[in-house]
């Protein structure tokens, strides 16, 4: 039976740890120049409604590393953009390829596609979640701290899709998530509810200083997501005081790790001094998209579960 990765909640704690372990092994093999064609003869469809740098490159290069082939499809250039149903598209693509990723505006598009696809489907970003990003983040944190359990991660800024996935990942990882966000920009209540009902530790503050207190890592993201350009000025005003600068970083634990899933709007949500500092894990985090996603692809496309 096929397994999809639409939400971070699709993984058990054991599966979560297994993917991180495999990702670390694949990373070592890549650095050592050891071939690992675990997906030889496999083709991945990459369906994009939203533009991307890291997502497209990491999946494309990842499939090449694994001996497979990645087929890029801009949704507007397919029959999806001309009115063909998601269900019919999923049925047809399932006859051509061995797996699919989707980067889309609406989470419902991915769940609908997965419902009718007979191949594994991976959420490469939706308005509700970004689970692949959180796996890369978890690999980065594990490399830095050794274990995830007991870490305090402070999220500063908009309670967006990445924040939702991070909150729900507290269940599998044992990480404590502290969110500092202005009122009206809180994460999805359903994500918070899920975490708290399943043993996760999550606290929401409207004060960034309280959120970062004793944090092992501080995570931020752009305040203005794609499609929100019309409310940019409003959000810039609302997020005054939530910039990750040196003063806020100094309120966290000593040598706290700085995370940002990129692209960064320097001078808005984060300063040059912080993102380029010795405490920045941002570039390792970006690289780890490649390794974490390769592990996800292997596990799903070889029926590893």
UniProtKB/Swiss-Prot annotation:
Keywords: Amino-acid biosynthesis, Arginine biosynthesis, Cytoplasm, Transferase. The keyword ATP-binding does not apply. One of its GO terms (biological process) is citrulline biosynthetic process. Carbamoyl phosphate binds at residues 52-55, 79, 103, 130-133, 261-262, 289. Coiled coil: none annotated. GO terms for molecular function: amino acid binding; ornithine carbamoyltransferase activity. Its EC number is 2.1.3.3. It comes from the Archaea. It catalyses: carbamoyl phosphate + L-ornithine = L-citrulline + phosphate + H(+). Disulfide bonds: none annotated. L-ornithine binds at residues 161, 221, 225-226. GO terms for cellular component: cytoplasm. It is found in: Cytoplasm. It is an enzyme of class 2 (transferase). SUPFAM superfamilies: Aspartate/ornithine carbamoyltransferase. InterPro entries: Asp/Orn_carbamoyltranf_P-bd, Asp/Orn_carbamoylTrfase, Asp/Orn_carbamoylTrfase_sf, Asp_carbamoyltransf_Asp/Orn-bd, Orn/put_carbamltrans, OTCase_ArgI. HAMAP family: OTCase. NCBIfam families: orni_carb_tr, PRK00779.1. Belongs to the aspartate/ornithine carbamoyltransferase superfamily. OTCase family. This is Ornithine carbamoyltransferase. It comes from Methanocorpusculum labreanum (strain ATCC 43576 / DSM 4855 / Z). The gene is argF.
């Amino acid at each position: 039976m096929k397994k999809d990765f639409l939400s971070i909640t699709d993984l058990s704690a054991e599966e979560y740890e297994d993917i991180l372990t495999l990702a670390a092994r694949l990373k070592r093999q890549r650095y050592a120049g050891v071939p690992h064609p675990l997906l030889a003869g496999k083709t991945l469809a990459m369906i994009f409604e939203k533009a991307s740098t890291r997502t497209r490159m990491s999946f494309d290069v990842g499939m090449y590393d694994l001996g497979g082939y990645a087929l890029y499809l801009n949704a507007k250039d397919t029959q999806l953009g001309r009115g063909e149903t998601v269900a019919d598209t999923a049925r047809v693509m399932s006859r051509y390829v061995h797996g699919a990723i989707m980067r889309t505006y609406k989470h419902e598009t991915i769940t609908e596609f997965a419902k009718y696809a007979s191949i594994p489907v991976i959420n490469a970003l939706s308005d509700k979640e970004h689970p692949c990003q959180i796996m890369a983040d978890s690999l980065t944190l594990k490399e830095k701290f050794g274990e995830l359990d007991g870490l305090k991660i402070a999220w500063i800024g908009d309670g967006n899709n990445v924040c939702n996935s991070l909150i729900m990942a507290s269940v599998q990882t044992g990480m404590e998530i502290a969110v500092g966000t202005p009122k009206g920009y809180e994460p999805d209540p359903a994500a918070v509810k899920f975490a708290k009902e399943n043993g996760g530790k999550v606290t929401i503050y409207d004060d960034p200083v309280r959120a970062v207190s004793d944090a092992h890592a501080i995570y931020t993201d752009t305040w203005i997501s794609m499609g929100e350009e019309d409310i940019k000025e409003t959000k810039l005003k609302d997020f005054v005081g939530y910039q990750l600068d040196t003063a806020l970083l100094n309120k966290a634990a000593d040598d706290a790790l700085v995370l940002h899933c990129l692209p960064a709007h320097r001078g808005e949500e984060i300063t040059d001094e912080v993102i380029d500092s010795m405490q920045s894990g941002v570039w390792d985090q970006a690289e780890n998209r490649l390794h974490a996603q390769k592990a996800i692809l292997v596990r799903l496309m070889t029926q590893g579960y």
